Regions:
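Short, Lys/Arg-enriched N-terminal segments with co-localized hydrophobic residues
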Residues: 19-32
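Active-site entrance/lid segments in N-terminal catalytic domains of soluble metabolic enzymes
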Residues: 31-236, 372
Length: 387
């Protein structure tokens, strides 16, 4: 018999011949679609490690998958060759399912005046690190080539952000055996993904760290919180919904399920794991951050993204509206951010993190998944007992 010590009723004696049902089990039975989605994903727990381009690693994805969750590789800035290398590395470490994420984007052709103005704006910041800004050799990876690599690699899950696929592309991924997940920051975007045949929608609230995935309408209008976004998406589409944004522990997982989500995607929660790809300076910033230390900014990449406030964010705040759109600004600041990481300078790093950063835990990924699972089961029990 399992007791939940917070509930006084559970400590009272039972009449002979009676037994007390497991509240966690009872709640799970009330969420049958959760088990259905987990079966489709091929995982035991409703925990998905968020794809974090530049910060995740094959070791992180493999550890999460091996622990019963779903590990993800953020491939938005990986070349097709690097995508293949990363996928092979995951498969060498685990035979469990994993996913890969791409940015749906077109390669830009910015005018020279825009590029030159942006480089001049960044020159003082480069100078602080003893460097001069240089024009990048490419603005971004070619999405068409990345997509072909994704189809060939056949991960269990293919997820997308920044834009939307067409129905033919979704059909190709289905033929390759991939479950297609589309990121939505609004109800309209969730409906759009359902209409092109996506299997799952990831509803990403404004609390989430890193880049906003908005592709319909204005970024400002799309700043809907997870608590408001998830149930509206659940009601709007007939496909499963994954909740993302601000979820850091098992209580958040249970809360998301209570809203109708069938799993959660957690990025910031896994950033401090030793398997992640961030450097010492970034780790120190995470350890010191509080709940009020993040905000959305365009200064690093040209696309709104949530990160820990630092000197570069503040220095360019007045110029934010003039920053060229992603991926141009992202490419122009790339060398600066790499140099800052090498020099241990948090002042010039894009310290992507969500509003839950104050609750980050520096645990090995597999151990963190186990802790999250225990917390989730306990929270399910509390919800069942309160019902």
């Amino acid at each position: 018999m399992r007791c939940w010590p917070h509930c006084k009723a559970h400590n009272s004696p039972l009449p002979p011949g009676f037994h007390r049902p497991d509240p966690a089990s009872a709640l799970q039975k009330s969420l049958p679609m959760t088990s259905s989605l987990l079966q489709r994903l091929g995982i035991a727990l409703p925990i998905i490690q968020g794809p974090m381009t530049g910060s995740d690693t094959p070791a992180l994805a493999a550890a999460v998958s091996a622990a019963g969750g779903l590990g993800m590789l953020g491939c938005g800035m990986r070349s097709p060759a690097a995508m293949a290398e990363a996928a092979a590395a995951v498969r060498q470490q685990t035979d469990r399912p994993f996913g890969m994420n791409l940015f749906v984007q077109a390669t830009p052709n910015p005018d020279e005046a825009t590029v030159q103005a942006a480089m001049e704006r960044l020159a003082p910041l480069y100078a602080e690190l003893g460097l001069q800004p240089q024009r990048p050799t490419q603005w971004c990876e070619d999405f068409a080539a990345q997509f072909e690599a994704l189809v060939a690699l056949r991960p269990a899950v293919a997820s997308f952000t920044f834009g939307i696929l067409d129905a033919a592309q979704v059909a190709r991924l289905h033929a390759a055996g991939c479950l297609v997940v589309g990121t939505a920051t609004t109800v309209a975007e969730a409906r759009a993904w359902a209409q092109v045949g996506a299997d799952v929608v990831c509803a990403s609230g404004t609390e989430a760290g890193g880049h906003r995935g908005t592709f319909l309408g204005d970024f400002t209008a799309s700043q809907v919180g997870t608590l408001a976004l998830v149930p509206q998406c659940v009601d709007a589409v007939d496909i499963p919904v994954i909740a993302a944004g601000g979820i850091m522990d098992g209580r958040g997982i249970a809360a998301a399920q209570a809203l109708g989500a069938q799993a959660v995607q957690m990025g910031t929660a896994f950033l401090a794991c030793p398997e992640s790809g961030i450097g010492p300076a970034y780790r120190q910033a995470l350890a010191q951050a509080q709940d009020t230390d993040t905000r959305l900014t365009r200064v690093f990449s040209g696309r709104p993204a949530r990160g820990i406030v630092n000197a570069m964010m503040e220095a360019l705040a007045a110029e934010e509206d003039r920053v060229p759109a992603y991926p141009v600004q992202n490419a122009l600041t790339g060398a600066l951010r790499r140099a800052a990481a090498a020099q241990g300078r948090t002042s010039h790093l894009s310290l992507w993190a969500g509003q839950g950063v104050g609750a980050v835990r520096a645990l090995p990924a597999g151990e963190l998944v186990a802790v999250l699972a225990d917390e989730w089961r306990a929270a399910c029990g509390r919800l069942a007992a309160a019902a």
